[in-house]
C-alpha cells in the first residue's frame, strides 16, 4: 500500500575533483539520510565532478558501470528510493546528462536531460552543454512504490509545460537534480522552483551541489523542498548538508481539487 507521508532527503554535496571521493561522499550522505528516516533520497546534478564540460568525457559511465550496482545494492540495503542526481552517461558515441533512479535493489529507470544549458550572459557567464551532451527527448514518469514521480534536470525547470506534462501523467512529486550558477541562482532559483510547484500542483524537490568558490562554475546551493501551493517547506544555504523533511501527498489532491488547473 502506498504511503502518503514520506520523509525526503536532499543531499547538498561538496563536490571534489576526484570521481571516487564524490561517490564515497554520496554514499556517506545517503547513509546519514537513512539514519534520519528518509525513504527517498536525491543527489545533485553531476555529483561525480565539478561542473566543467572539459572534464565530462573523462568521467562518463554507462549503465553497466559498477556505480549502477553500488546504488542498486544501497537502495535495497537501506530500503530507500535513490534519485542519483545526474552523471555523464555514455551511450555509443554520445554523451548525456542522465539521472538514474533506483529502488528495491534495481535500476528502475533513467532520464536524460532534455533542455541543455546553453547561455551567454555577457560579462558574467557563458556555458554550452551542447558542446558535449546530446539532449534527451522524452518527458516521462516512473512508477515507484511511492506512486508516479517525474524527474527533470536543472535547465528543464525553465520550461513549465514540461513539468506540467509530468503532473498530467500522474506525478505528484517532481525531482530536480540541478546546479544553477552563482549568476542565475540569485536571479531565478527560488522563483523557478516555487513556480514549477505551483503550476504543476506537485511537490518539487530541487537538489544542488554546495557553493565552491574554487571552481570556474560555482553552483548556487539552496537545495529546496516546495509544496504544491508553491510554498517553500525548507531550503538550505550555500554550505553542504542534508535537507530532510516529511511531506504528505494528500496535500497534492487537496490543492488540485481547490484550484483545478491541470
Task: Locate predicted features.
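N-terminal active-site segment of His-dependent metallophosphoesterases
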Residues: 1-40, 175
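Short, glycine-anchored, charge-dense loop/turn motifs used at functional sites
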Residues: 8, 101-108, 226-234
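Hydrophobic residues at beta-strand termini and immediately following loops
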Residues: 11, 59, 111, 142, ...
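Active-site beta-loop-alpha junctions enriched in small/polar residues
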Residues: 13, 87, 113-114, 154, ...
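Cys-nucleophile CN-hydrolase/nitrilase-fold catalytic domain and related Cys-dependent amidase chemistry
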Residues: 19, 27-104, 110, 119, ...
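CN hydrolase (nitrilase-like) catalytic-core segments centered on the catalytic cysteine
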Residues: 63-83, 148, 157-243
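Short beta-strand scaffold segments in enzyme catalytic cores
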Residues: 84-86, 98-101, 140-142, 223-225, ...
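Active-site catalytic loop in hydrolytic enzyme cores
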Residues: 90-169, 182-191, 257-261
Amino acid at each position: 500500500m502506498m504511503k502518503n507521508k514520506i520523509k525526503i532527503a536532499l543531499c547538498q554535496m561538496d563536490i571534489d575533483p576526484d570521481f571516487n571521493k564524490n561517490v564515497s561522499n554520496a554514499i556517506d550522505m545517503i547513509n546519514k539520510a537513512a539514519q534520519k528516516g528518509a525513504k527517498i533520497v536525491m543527489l545533485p546534478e553531476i555529483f561525480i565532478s565539478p561542473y566543467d564540460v572539459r572534464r565530462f568525457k573523462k568521467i562518463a559511465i554507462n549503465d553497466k558501470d559498477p556505480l549502477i550496482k553500488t546504488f542498486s545494492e544501497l537502495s535495497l540495503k537501506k530500503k530507500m528510493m535513490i534519485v542519483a542526481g545526474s552523471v555523464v552517461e555514455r551511450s555509443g558515441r554520445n554523451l548525456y546528462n542522465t539521472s538514474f533512479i533506483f529502488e528495491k535493489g534495481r535500476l528502475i529507470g533513467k532520464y536524460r536531460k532534455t533542455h541543455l544549458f546553453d547561455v551567454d550572459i555577457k560579462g558574467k557567464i557563458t556555458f554550452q552543454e551542447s558542446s558535449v551532451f546530446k539532449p534527451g527527448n522524452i518527458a516521462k514518469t516512473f512508477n515507484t512504490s511511492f506512486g508516479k514521480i517525474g524527474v527533470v534536470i536543472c535547465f528543464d525547470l525553465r520550461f513549465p509545460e514540461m513539468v506540467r506534462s509530468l503532473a498530467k501523467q500522474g506525478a505528484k512529486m517532481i525531482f530536480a537534480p540541478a546546479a544553477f550558477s552563482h549568476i542565475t541562482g540569485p536571479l531565478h532559483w527560488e522563483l523557478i522552483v516555487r513556480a514549477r510547484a505551483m503550476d504543476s500542483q506537485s511537490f518539487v524537490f530541487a537538489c544542488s551541489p554546495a557553493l565552491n568558490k574554487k571552481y570556474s562554475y560555482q553552483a548556487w546551493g539552496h537545495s529546496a523542498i516546495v509544496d504544491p501551493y508553491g510554498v517553500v517547506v525548507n531550503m538550505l544555504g550555500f554550505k553542504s548538508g542534508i535537507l530532510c523533511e516529511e511531506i504528505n501527498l494528500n496535500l497534492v489532491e487537496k490543492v488540485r481539487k481547490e484550484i483545478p488547473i491541470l
